[in-house]
């Protein structure tokens, strides 16, 4: 005759030998029926599908203890065991302290504005410097030109007007022409001596007398021509 447990649980196998693993456990006769029920419920077995299987609440604790035996937790214990032969190596980078004040981070917009402002100020300063340099160069050039002209004026000897004095003496009013020729010779002597001040004075006098002699001579020639014409006209009527 079948036992009461077999009648109540027809789906359970008759022997739990197929549930033995490679690691034998100490079996306790009172709790084996509960383990058998739990294994049968979890793993399933052959039997009629319409039969209802009842679970004893009191045997649940024993079933859980049987399920979580050292054989089931063997892999977990192996995983949790500390590794005696392993060691961790950490690499740390030593950063030397930077000398000077720390730089404040600036955004791209602010950096662009700073660069633009510096560029503008630099261009204005350079332009002002170029203008000042140009003005200084122009002033120095003007000063040097004036000094050169003064030097040239002082170094150039005055003219003696020899040809003009000769013409005034021979062809024009000869008394003034002779005086102009005299001052012309004095100019040449002053130039030869290096006295440019006296040479310039005598040169101006010679020029004035020669011009006056020419003017007086021209006036005399005109007067003589007019007198001659008047005389010829009177003789013709008489």
Swiss-Prot record:
UniProt keyword list: Golgi apparatus, Membrane, Transmembrane, Transmembrane helix
Region Disordered: start-end pairs: 1-29, 83-111, 127-154
Positions with biased composition (Acidic residues): 129-151
Record's subcellular location: Membrane; Golgi apparatus, cis-Golgi network
Keyword match Transmembrane helix: yes
InterPro entries reported for this sequence: CD225/Dispanin_fam
Superkingdom field: Eukaryota
UniProt keyword Cell inner membrane, yes or no: no
Ranges annotated as spanning the membrane: 163-183, 206-226
Extracellular-side positions: 1-162, 227-238
Membrane topology, as annotated: Multi-pass membrane protein
One cellular component term from this protein's GO annotations in UniProt: membrane
Segments on the Cytoplasmic side according to the record's topology features: 184-205
Entry similarity comment: Belongs to the CD225/Dispanin family.
Protein name (Swiss-Prot/TrEMBL): Synapse differentiation-inducing gene protein 1-like
Organism: Homo sapiens (Human)
Lineage of the species this protein comes from: Eukaryota, Metazoa, Chordata, Craniata, Vertebrata
Gene for this chain: SYNDIG1L
């Amino acid at each position: 005759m079948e036992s009461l447990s077999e009648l109540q649980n027809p789906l359970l196998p008759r022997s739990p030998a197929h549930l033995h693993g490679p690691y034998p456990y100490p079996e306790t006769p009172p709790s084996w029926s509960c383990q058998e029920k739990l294994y049968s419920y979890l793993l399933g077995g052959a039997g009629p599908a319409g039969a209802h299987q009842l679970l004893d609440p009191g045997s649940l604790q024993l079933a859980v203890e049987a399920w979580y035996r050292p054989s089931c937790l063997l892999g977990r214990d192996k995983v949790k065991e500390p590794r005696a032969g392993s060691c961790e190596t950490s690499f740390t980078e030593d950063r030397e302290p930077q000398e000077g004040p720390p730089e404040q981070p600036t955004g791209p917009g602010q950096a662009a504005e700073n660069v633009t402002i510096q560029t503008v100020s630099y261009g204005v300063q350079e332009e002002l410097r170029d203008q000042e340099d140009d003005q200084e160069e122009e002033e120095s050039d003007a000063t040097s030109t004036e000094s050169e002209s003064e030097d040239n004026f002082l170094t150039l000897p005055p003219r003696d007007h020899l040809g003009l004095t000769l013409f005034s003496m021979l062809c024009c009013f000869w008394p003034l022409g002779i005086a102009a020729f005299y001052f012309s010779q004095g100019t040449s002597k002053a130039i030869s001596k290096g006295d440019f001040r006296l040479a310039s004075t005598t040169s101006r006098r010679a020029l004035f007398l020669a011009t006056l002699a020419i003017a007086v001579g021209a006036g005399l020639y005109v007067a003589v021509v007019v007198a001659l014409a008047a005389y010829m006209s009177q003789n013709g009527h008489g």
